[in-house]
Amino acid sequence: MGHSPVATALVALSLAVLAPCALAAPGFSDTLIGYRYSDHYTDPGKTKDVAKNILQITHVSSYRLGQNFINLDVFKSDRNDPAKGGGTGATEFYLTYRNQLQYGKFFDKPLAFGPVKDVALTAGLDYNTKNNEFASEKRLLVLGPTLKFALPAGFLDASVLYAREWNHCGLDVCSKPGNHTDLLFDPFFQFNLTWGVPFTAG
């Protein structure tokens, strides 16, 4: 199964830019562009530390019925994590998208009880591709309820998500009889906590 990291990056960046524009309404909106570097990353099957340059683009926004979260990480490895065929380090793209459809915004009255101020339905996907020998192509879909807790300031969300993952193995061993290059994993549940609480240091 071939893939083009450049094409994938364009698709991912298009999602990151266009989805919020299509869904956003008056409310909050924030975008972060960041950069990270370390020469002490470890990858499965690698005996040496891997140096990686990482570009991050994150966007969060509200819209009439809920809110969006989009994150794209672009990883560029050194030669200790080579691209297929060698000569340069591998490049990986990892896109995460989550959308919340809030009960209170849909019905104009929150579903509140105890410490919970509202309930939402969360849906989303993870999309990954990497141009090394393994050639992973992760496709993850998630769906499930989210409890939105009332806090004096900030937010706290707890989600239970039903998840299903598809992936790809480009190694020669995966093409041998009895093995598979395209993989479908058993369904599983994700338990996610997301929070942001302001505080003052010093």
Can you describe what each PLM-predicted range is?
Residues 23-29, 60, 65-70, 103-120, ...:
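Short loop/turn motifs that connect adjacent beta-strands in outer-membrane beta-barrel proteins
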Residues 24-75:
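Short glycine/proline- and aromatic-enriched beta-strand/turn motifs that initiate or cap beta-hairpins
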Residues 31, 53-57, 93-97, 139-145, ...:
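Hydrophobic, lipid-facing positions within transmembrane beta-strands of outer-membrane proteins
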Residues 37-41, 74-78, 125-131, 162-168:
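Transmembrane beta-strands of outer-membrane beta-barrel pores
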Residues 71-130:
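Surface-exposed loop and membrane-interface regions of Gram-negative outer-membrane beta-barrel proteins
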Residues 134-202:
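Detector for outer-membrane/organellar transmembrane beta-barrel domains
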